[in-house]
Amino acid sequence: MLTNIIILIILYLFYDFCYKNFKYRNYGSPWALPVIGHFIHVINQPHLVVHNDRMKYNNGRFVNYWFGDYLSIAITDPILYKKIYLNFPKQINSRLKSPTVLNISERFRGIISSNENNWDFHHGILSKLFNGHKAKINNFLFEKETKFIIEYMKKISKSGENFDTRSNFLYFYSNILFDYILGKRVENIYENELRKDRKKFMVSIQEVMDSVGLIKFLNYLILSYPFLSIYLRYFTYTTFNLKKILKQYYDEHLETIDLNKPRDVLDNLIMEYKNQNAIECDKSFVAIAIELLAAGTDTNSSTSEWFLTYLVNNPIYQDKIYDELIGALKINKPLKGSDVLINLSHRPLTPLFNATLKEVLRLIPATPFSVPRMSNEGFEVDGIKIPKGTYLFPSMYSIFRDEKYWGENANKFYPERFLTDSHSNNYFPYGVGKRMCLGSNFSQHELYICLTNIVLNFKIKSIDGKPLNEIPNYGITFRPNIFEVKLENR
């Protein structure tokens, strides 16, 4: 009996090895191991592995990998990326339906992880709240929070203390989102003890989101799904506690809502569910809130850290941007009573700042890999056959550093490249197509208002006079090493 089992296992391993390595061998890829596929190959700094592999296979356009049971395609060429995402939205309008995603998203009810039906409904609601006439309300929130962080930074500068970029940017962006989504802004968050609870909440959200990261083996091994589901349901507490807290917020809103005066995103979501006679609004809200708070806070806080990193390491740009901001204020004076000096009306007058922020997002995209898609039916593009059930993940790191499109200095910090060319054909940090980031304007506006006013008010220096580390740490988002900076009032 035991011998037969061993023989069956060996035969299965041989079959799986042959299937993974010869079924789609006409598309170049590294050799895959049975069962686990390429997990060992990409386990260490996967963005660099993919970036190096792209030059060995398929003319630098894509690389095939096997993650467990799933054929996966890393898209490394911007033209191919746009062709697939713009021309085949119906075929790729799905996500990986693993037990981890199912657990976090309340059965795919979120906005990032949602299935096809839930996405259309929730996108229709949220797109109205993050764009259009709501933009003025959003900008007021950005300006108000920027005023508070600038005041705190002035205190830090006066005291001679260093500015903790990681914690304070997390507080800044989470406070905006908590205010907008839940009406739960924390006053004096930069000095108040309540910030510890907020940080703990955000760390918990990040832990939950990390569990669905690209290199989480059991999410891709179908045989493990029953066991993984049991583990997630009965032995993980972070997700349970987060959902419990968010459900309390939902119940509070349900009791106090004024249907004629919605206060925040949650009120609007409740009202839309009532209007549509939809059910289980609480579960949808929990999934949406986790995803919005995680994505909206972590991406922009890390981008802000990287922006300061490059300004510290390239002080000439810091001075040039400051001069540009002063010039913009002379042309377009700030509104009387405004919380900040620089606002969105100055944006057309600050081309160098705009180019510098674009360059930071090019070199260090918010996420190394765009949120992956799953093909729900087979299709063909440029002679490349993509079967049903294929996992597609654009490598933004590779797309934004391809010398074919960005020149020999693709790996260098050079903001001027965006002063002469918008690079619209190969620069899309918020994605493309039907399911691109719905909060792209929200994100860009809060980054602009926050970072311009920081540069306007302070000279930013490293605490030891040495350059800051520019090597990103791989994760759901690219993070720099934790660092502090010196602030000098201008």
UniProtKB/Swiss-Prot annotation:
Which enzyme class, named as a word? oxidoreductase
Its record classes its membrane topology as: Single-pass membrane protein
What are the UniProt keywords, alphabetically? Answer: Heme, Iron, Membrane, Metal-binding, Monooxygenase, Oxidoreductase, Transmembrane, Transmembrane helix
Q: Which CDD domains match?
A: CYP1_2-like
Q: Name one Pfam family in it.
A: p450
GO molecular function: any one? iron ion binding
Membrane-spanning ranges: 2-22
Query: Looking at the record's lineage, which domain of life comes first?
Result: Eukaryota
A Gene Ontology CC term for this entry? membrane
Main location as per UniProt:
membrane
What EC number(s) does its UniProt record assign? Answer: 1.14.-.-
Q: Which Gene3D superfamilies match?
A: Cytochrome P450
Q: Where does heme bind?
A: 437
Q: Where in the cell is it found?
A: Membrane
Query: Which cofactor(s) are needed, names only?
Result: heme
UniProt keyword Transmembrane, yes or no = yes
Q: Which family does it belong to?
A: Belongs to the cytochrome P450 family.
Question: Protein name, please?
Answer: Probable cytochrome P450 518B1
Q: Which organism is it from?
A: Dictyostelium discoideum
Top-down, what is the taxonomic lineage of the species of origin?
A: Eukaryota, Amoebozoa, Evosea, Eumycetozoa, Dictyostelia
